C-alpha cells in the first residue's frame, strides 16, 4: 500500500516512483510537486535506443534493410535524417549493422554536437572527456568528409582519464575503421602545453551529477549523496 499523498507527498512520490526522498524533496522545492511528478514519470518511461547511420559510407537503405531483416523495429529519430530509434532486439552486439560498423549507438543530443561544431578541412580537434567516443567518432567522420579533397588533413584526439575508458574508444575506432582519430589516456585537469592554442575545436562533455539520466541508469539514484 502506498503512503498517503495528503499526509506526506514526498514519501508518496518516493515510493510510487522508486526515488530517494532526498531527491524528491529537493525537486519539489525547486520545481513544485506537479512538475516533479512529471519528471519522475519520465524517468520510468522506456526510452528507445538511438543509432547514427554512417550514411556517408553505407547507403541508408542498406542499413535500414539490414536492421529490419534481423527483426528490429526501426523508426526515424527526430531532427536528423541519419538517426534511427530501434527496438525489438536482444543485444546491439548481435546486430550485423553494428558489427560491420554501419551504425553507432548515440543519442540525438550527442549527434547535434558534431552538427553545431561543423569541422572544417584540416581542423585539429580534441575531446577531453570522450569515452565511449560517440561525439569524437561523429566529428571525425564529418572531418573526413571535409578533408577528402584537401591536401591538409585534420585530426581528432579523443581523451579520457583511464585506460579502460580509452579502450572503449579504441574499440569503436577499430570497428568503424577510422584513421583520423586516436585515443589518449590523459587527465583533463592537467595543463597540456603541446596543444596550447592549437585546437580549432574543443569538446568537453564534463562529468556531472548524472541526475538527468536516471531513466537510462537507474542505479545512479541510489549512489547520489546529498552534498
Regions found by a protein language model. Name each.
Residues 1-227:
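S-adenosylmethionine
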